[in-house]
Amino acid sequence: YALEELDPFQISFYRIFIGMVFINLLNIKKVNIPLSQHKYLALVGTLWMALPFFLFAKAEETISSSLAGLINGSTPIFISLIAYIVFKEKISNIQKTYLITGFLGIYLVSFGFNNFLLDLNLGAFLALLASISYGFAANIVQPLIKNYGSLNTLKIALRYGALFSLIALLPSSSLVLPTVEISLFPMLLLGIGSSGIAFLSFYKLIDDVGAVAGSITVYIIPIFSVIFGYIFLEEYTSTIQMVGIFIVIISAYQFSKKRN
């Protein structure tokens, strides 16, 4: 709905800015994080917020919201691959198997769209880049959360994300305020619900079980993308998509079970 009034630059900025205000009101105390760590917080603000938020908003100009959510469900694959290849984190062979079956489920859900091959354009590519960006950010943020806590880490990362989104917005677009009639409620929902509450919950999960194990919860995103796409946007869900969703749920459960 927000795309009816706002462009991708504006959506990216407002959802980060609203989330930043919300989280900073939750914790008004001064955060003492060494300046040497701020480059990593800035990376998180860029790779977890400013860049993927813009990419997903831009992608949904040409693909359905359901398809964008389904592609987002591939994020755990990239988190695991990047953790294994770049950050040398170990996962068992059986966990690799469940990641593969989870990806298979996402594949089935994606190809359940009758027009998937037509949709596989620049929008799908941008959504895939956003998922890869999440993969790097999740691995970078894990030690920050361990050392400084989930709330403090998110608080500063959102500040950097808002700053970088504003820098990208000013030369490329204009500062149009969301209106009550069209985009204000969607932006409040994205800002408070997603950038605020959901990210804080996910950061706490990363603190408890790590980026790889915590990322398996992202497999739930395609489920709600399909459901909400059908309810609010009348996007079609086929039988093969339901089969794919079932595989995703089973894979997520088994992966978490083995991790525990």
Segment roles from a protein language model:
Residues 23, 82, 91-113, 131, ...:
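Hydrophobic transmembrane alpha-helices of multi-pass small-molecule transport proteins
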Residues 7-8, 64, 87-91, 149-150, ...:
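A helix-boundary/kink motif common to multi-pass secondary transporters
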Residues 24-72, 108, 191-209:
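Specific transmembrane alpha-helical segments of multi-pass solute transporters/efflux pumps
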Residues 1-5, 61, 65, 110-122, ...:
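Membrane-interface helix termini and inter-helical loops of multi-pass transporters
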Residues 46-50, 54, 77-81, 107, ...:
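Hydrophobic/small/kink-forming positions within alpha-helical transmembrane segments
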Residues 3-4, 60, 87, 145, ...:
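Helix-capping/transition residues at the boundaries of transmembrane alpha-helices
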Residues 7-25, 43, 94-104, 122-129, ...:
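Hydrophobic alpha-helical transmembrane segments of multi-pass integral membrane proteins
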Residues 13-14, 53, 67-74, 140-163, ...:
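Helix-helix packing/entry segments at the starts of transmembrane helices
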